[in-house]
């Protein structure tokens, strides 16, 4: 049973996390309900740029930004599917509003807009997503697999991927290197 809504929160993988998909990750939760949770890993770039992705989709772009804009590994589910996390929410064919400021879009129209220089003000593009069955995320939290903190869009959209985990930890006032692999409940 869902006890807290983690939508628009970060999940910070604890040092003891051994799952190779999630070790040392920062995951942004886009949706959390009694039906489960959906999130995107926001600190693990893959060897693909936005220009590469647009080329694969036969969407032409001469925008220099797309040549150096990294694509993130969003999670191990549907690795062939693209997800665009963006500010503002805007109006796209297939958008889920995470909150009043952040949207998650899966339709090609947003990629075409990006290629034409008409993209949302802030964006992160990922392949794949992270998903949890009903009650799974709560179970993992009870086993101390994750720390949670309300998300900061500035961390997602304004910092390089390699700085995001540390910045999220600072929101909690915690240094990642000081965390123990051995944790328990009082």
Swiss-Prot record:
GO cellular component: cytosol
Cited NCBIfam families: PRK00228.1-1 (NF001266)
HAMAP family according to UniProt: UPF0301
Family according to the record: Belongs to the UPF0301 (AlgH) family.
Protein name (database record): UPF0301 protein Nmul_A2478
